[in-house]
From Swiss-Prot:
Organism for this UniProt entry: Buchnera aphidicola subsp. Acyrthosiphon pisum (strain 5A)
Similarity comment text for this entry: Belongs to the acyl carrier protein (ACP) family.
Gene3D superfamilies listed in its UniProt record: ACP-like (1.10.1200.10)
Top-level taxon in the UniProt lineage: Bacteria
Residue ranges of domain Carrier in the record: 2-77
SUPFAM superfamilies assigned to the protein according to its UniProt record, in alphabetical order: ACP-like
Protein name, entry field: Acyl carrier protein
Entry-linked HAMAP family: Acyl_carrier
PTM field: 4'-phosphopantetheine is transferred from CoA to a specific serine of apo-ACP by AcpS. This modification is essential for activity because fatty acids are bound in thioester linkage to the sulfhydryl of the prosthetic group.
PTM-bearing positions, type O-(pantetheine 4'-phosphoryl)serine: 37
Job description of the protein: Carrier of the growing fatty acid chain in fatty acid biosynthesis.
Length: 80
C-alpha cells in the first residue's frame, strides 16, 4: 500500500508546489499545505485520474488531509 501513499504525495507535491518533506500524512490540505478550494478540487480530479476512480462531491468534502486521501483510495481499491 506504500505505492498509493507515494503516488498521492507526488500528486500533492505537483499540484500544490510544496516540498515533499513538508507533506505529512496528518497534514490538512487547507490549514497545513495552503491549498484553497480550487486547489482541493484539482487534487480530487488528479486523484480520480491517477487511480481511475470517481469521487462524489460528498466524498470529496471528507477528503481534507493526506491520510484521509490515502485511506479513501485504499478502500476504493479494495472494492474493485
Amino acid at each position: 500500500m506504500k505505492n498509493i501513499e507515494e503516488r498521492i504525495k507526488k500528486i500533492i507535491f505537483e499540484k500544490l508546489d510544496i516540498k515533499q518533506e513538508k507533506i505529512f500524512n496528518d497534514a490538512s490540505f487547507i490549514d497545513d499545505l495552503g491549498a484553497d478550494s480550487l486547489d482541493t478540487v484539482e487534487l480530487i480530479m488528479a486523484l480520480e485520474e491517477e487511480f481511475d476512480i470517481e469521487i462524489s462531491d460528498e466524498e470529496a468534502e471528507k477528503i481534507n488531509t493526506v491520510q484521509k486521501s490515502i485511506d479513501f483510495i485504499q478502500n476504493k481499491n479494495l472494492k474493485k
